Amino acid sequence: MFIFQFLLLLPPTLRCFSKFPFPQTASSLTRAFSQSTSMSINLHSHAFSGNPLLSKFPLPGNPLSPSAALEALNARISLNNTHSSPSPSFKVLPFRNGRPLASSSAGTGDSPPIWDLGWLGLDDLRGIFENSGAQLSVDLLVYLNSSSEDDAVYWAIDVSDKVPELGSNNAAGLCFVELRTLMVATDWSDLQLMGNLAIAGHAKALLEWHNFSRFCGHCGEKTVPMEAGRRKKCSNDSCKKRIYPRVDPVVIMLVIDRENDRALLAKRPMRIARLYTCLSGFTEPGESLEEAVRRETWEETGIEVGEVVYHSSQPWPVAPNSIPCQLMVGFFAYAKSLEITVDKTELEDAQWFSREDVRKALTFAKYKQAQRTAAEKVEQMCKGLEKNRSLASDLNVESADEQHASIVVPGPFAIAYHLISSWAFSDQNVVNGVECNSKNPSDL
Ligand SMILES: [Zn+2]
């Protein structure tokens, strides 16, 4: 089954972390990143992982815990008390139709613009609701976590059918942007931005899960939030089923022909020409991940797989098919047979590619150019100069050097890139300006 993987991205310079709201967490991420310059896997390296708000949840009794924060939030909203204690501060990230509120600022020198998340204070949000004649209620807010360093609690809210003026007044420099666009616009070496991207991905996944779990699947009654929106339960007293946020595991595998030093890459029926990537598919109930790798590979290409070796995993909250969050679980899969029979209902093409061909695709891809294009698009949107078009139509994904590379492969924000590059360049740490924090398949 197809999982959409886009191309692109990444300049090499690290920017400072002056805007990062969680200095100690940022430091720990920095350490993790610097420690990963060897060929070991850096679990913070994948886009949408390394969320600084997910590293620790406060225990019950802590004033920043979900229950205590919810109580404080309830008091401030229901009492309309604007003069209450400023501690803790509440920061809310609004979403509209799955798009987070964002801003953009100029980069330094020749570097691309830098996007940021559009956090709003509680009083500002309440004012925006009041101006629109909408009611801000506690149940709309979903707890993301807190930060003791800045004494703040972070929330997300879906404002899709409310407060229409939010994001439309470009004087404020704020607009709602597709998460995929932000993903491509993110400088992969900027840990602050990578952390922000992960926060937005987590928030988007939680809000989408809330949207489609409004009714109990057992009795049909309405569900209500629990634990400040981190869980839900059925409102029917005779049912009371608990409902947990949904994660869908997807296997993604680079199938390797050891004998002939080739890798199997497939082209999905999509508009992005020349894009070849790893095979992938959802796991079935009752199936192990390794079994899913073998089954999907056989179904889509007729190749039989023997050994299956885990590589790394990546949260993927930007799938196009209304699934809140897939967990991409990456593997190397070693082929036992080599003859390809393409399932034309799933794939347009599948071929064995030599290591040399794959190296060319990685070497001549213009990831940095694509990142700049997306970052400039976000800047234009926040100025009100461009509408939110689909990503595929914006990006010149054919920008890879066709003279030197016959195919293009997904960019560094996709786990497919890391599977492919760690096989193709198993002897190098940096490829085309992108740091490879990946396991060498020859070491497995
Ligand atoms: Zn129920």
Regions found by a protein language model. Give the residues of each.
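Nudix hydrolase/Nudix homology domain
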Residues: 2-8, 12-15, 19-22, 28-213, ...
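Short cysteine-rich clusters marking metal-coordination/redox-active sites
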Residues: 216-219, 234-236
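N-terminal strand-loop-strand
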Residues: 227-228, 232-278, 310-311, 333
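Short loop/turn microsegments at loop-to-beta-strand junctions
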Residues: 250-251, 289, 348
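Short, catalytically relevant binding-site loops at active-site mouths
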Residues: 270-272, 283-285, 315-317
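The catalytic Nudix box helix
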Residues: 277-312, 331, 336-339
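Acidic pyrophosphate-coordinating catalytic loop
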Residues: 314-326, 339
